[in-house]
Swiss-Prot record:
ATP binds at P117, T118, G119, S120, G121, K122, T123, L124. ATP-dependent specificity component of the Clp protease. It directs the protease to specific substrates. Can perform chaperone functions in the absence of ClpP. The keyword Metal-binding applies. The gene is clpX. GO terms for biological process: cell division; proteolysis involved in protein catabolic process. This is ATP-dependent Clp protease ATP-binding subunit ClpX. Pfam families: AAA_2, ClpB_D2-small, zf-C4_ClpX.
Amino acid sequence: MFKFNDEKGQLKCSFCGKTQTQVRKLVAGPGVYICDECIELCTEIVQEELAKDEEVEFKDVPKPVEIREILDEYVIGQDNAKKALAVAVYNHYKRINSNSKIDDVELAKSNIALIGPTGSGKTLLAQTLARILNVPFAIADATSLTEAGYVGEDVENILLKLIQAADYDVEKAEKGIIYIDEIDKVARKSENPSITRDVSGEGVQQALLKILEGTVASVPPQGGRKHPHQEFIQIDTTNILFICGGAFDGIEPIIKRRLGEKVIGFGSEKKNADVNEKHVLSHVLPEDLLRFGLIPEFIGRLPVIANLEPLDEDALVDILTKPKNALVKQFQKLLELDDVELEFEEGALIEIAKKAIERKTGARGLRSIIEGLMLEVMFELPSRKDIEKCILTKETVADNAAPKLVLQDGTVLDTKTSA
């Protein structure tokens, strides 16, 4: 313990020995002084210890209706998928709270398959679920995975991403959510098992089986391939919720063929024509996934199948404007920081939606379209102090015309911002 003061009579911190002139604040107690730096250090130590002792529990898991309501704030449409996800997630964490057994009845895990076109909201739904539940969340790309012994990522690297998202708190990671994207890309190339190796297809499905079902996996802390004499992080995947998403391009004819066969048998081609193109995926069954190329054991690990519909023009316009973090609101906020008001005319929003449909990118392509439209504006406006308002019109999107700019004196410019 340091003396309270030095030879010059200056007060000192009793812990680090710094004088009152070397620190911002010195707090006095009964026979002791402590500086602001030591207080901050002590606070960090206490918080770390409390975080370690805090057991990860889910006593107040939102009810399915509440989960759906929160999803509605961020994701437009897709009501059936939201309901399926809300129920599956609620049951999953209810199962964790019950320690997987109720009166000796073991509750099985319900991983989820999300099937829908690109840009329909699969990843956003999974991300929002993790945010609602405040659990670690990781996204993995199935196309980068290969089975053990081949060039590519081991499936255990998926778990490493979750551990990293949990700041290496393994107990917390063991109750997280992993979203595996592009799972349709690991379908085997034909319905019949082949004697040749399918390194990026069936082999990956086989490798994923154990972690989907629940196992204690050994994860290399630095990622990459496993090798002998290496330290591993042990993680139990029993309570990790896996959501596997994919576009499953080409599954529609499989579904139509089955629907035709089941309904009238001979002459099913005619019946297929009556199936609503937009709602084909709503009829998907495990047997369709089997014909598509997923192996039976893998399908069995994904008992909940939720489909997402393609987004139409109205849905895309709603996505641009209605969610809490809608793109229009984001760009309006960006320009507001430069003291400029941004307005999107209704015609502009409709044209943006049409472009996204033409490009077949769904909601995912909306940002890139707006970024392209706003490039010149966002380049010029920070240097222009005379502009009060920027208006994107139908012509701005459809004909690549310059946005309307309103000056502070009310003058409207229809030319480029450099005018």
